Amino acid sequence: MKLKSLLLRYYPPGIMLEYEKGGELKTKSIDLLELSPSTDVNTLVGEIQQAEPLITASRTKQVRLLVQRLQEKLRQHSDHNFYLFKVLRAHILPLTNVALNKAGSCFITGSYDRTCKVWDTASGEELHTLEGHKNVVYAIAFNNPYGDKIATGSFDKTCKLWSAETGKCYHTFRGHTAEIVCLSFNPQSTVVATGSMDTTAKLWDIQNGEEVVTLTGHLAEIISLSFDTSGDRIITGSFDHTVVVWDASTGRKVHTLIGHCAEISSALFNWDCSLILTGSMDKTCMLWDATSGKYVATLTGHDDEILDSCFDYTGKLIATASADGTARVYNATTRKCVTKLEGHEGEISKISFNPQGNRLLTGSSDKTARIWDVQTGQCLQVLEGHTDEIFSCAFNYKGNIVITGSKDNSCRIWR
């Protein structure tokens, strides 16, 4: 085995190794999920070299520099103050969702006007209008990290695949018998998965446009789906109160997670795929062992439905957003509530961590989005100006741009 090159992955922090084995080029990753700006670099480099035989003494200096660069990234933009950069009167009817490509260079908006629009983040200019759906465009996504394709899921029961560069439609995926309300690309960008009100999810081949497999078994609509980091498994959350883990290649049901007593609002894996987090209208989140499917813990404290939940990039922290107008941060290991975020005057429908993991972004029906300090729970900034409910908001991959989408038909770029 011969080490060819070392590459960086910023969020979550890691070093990718490209090496040659038996004439073949292979890759493996060293995950540095515990890395913080205060980590002692020399100690960590020593630990990395002990654990990874490919990294010999001659690479010590290079690895030290890489770890220092990762630390710099964790410090970057962490005290960023956002200002309103652009208001885009994006659509003639309300927006449904916003999504950014990994580079943050462009973003997309879905709307009740049956279109999806592609925007240039730097200028706020419209690049393309993706037309062709015959009903609301509800679920939208880029095939990150590549960002060269866009998927749109519609109430017209179809999903379309588009070129992000030209706006050309590659495929229309037909087969669902009711509205498509969620979708996701697998990490390899070879498959797109769609979840529907028809109680099924379908996986589609991006190259040939064919249906790969249908995931059947839920008794009510599927409103949440996501792949694990490897793309081998997919989870679906349903209004039937259950979450199912499936084998993505065969469509076989691996586990059914039963425990919630109301509709599921979100379901996702943590980074290392050891845990599954499920949020529900029963006011709780639950944690499950991703390998065995066994129940691990319940996160309690909210007084109303949980509308969104997420892990930070490393999987150490969990954030929950509720109709009770508060958000909470939990430690994923101890399952204790670390901080409570109070200040919104309406339900919080969206929550996400910045890539560095020290800030949270929330969007609310009180027409504001807010930036919070994860450790203290203090509100650092209120992003004001929308004249109706904010139901979609997102950080870019660097954490220095925020996009908000509102029922007021506009979206705003904050930077």
UniProtKB/Swiss-Prot annotation:
Subunit and interaction comment: Interacts with IFT46.
Protein name, UniProt field: Dynein assembly factor with WD repeat domains 1
WD repeat locations: 90-129, 132-174, 175-214, 217-256, 259-298, 301-340, 343-384, 386-415
Primary localization class, coarse: cytoplasm
Pfam families in UniProt: WD40
Location in the cell: Cytoplasm, Cytoskeleton, Flagellum basal body; Cytoplasm, Cytoskeleton, Flagellum axoneme
GO CC, any one term: ciliary basal body
Native source organism of the sequence: Mus musculus
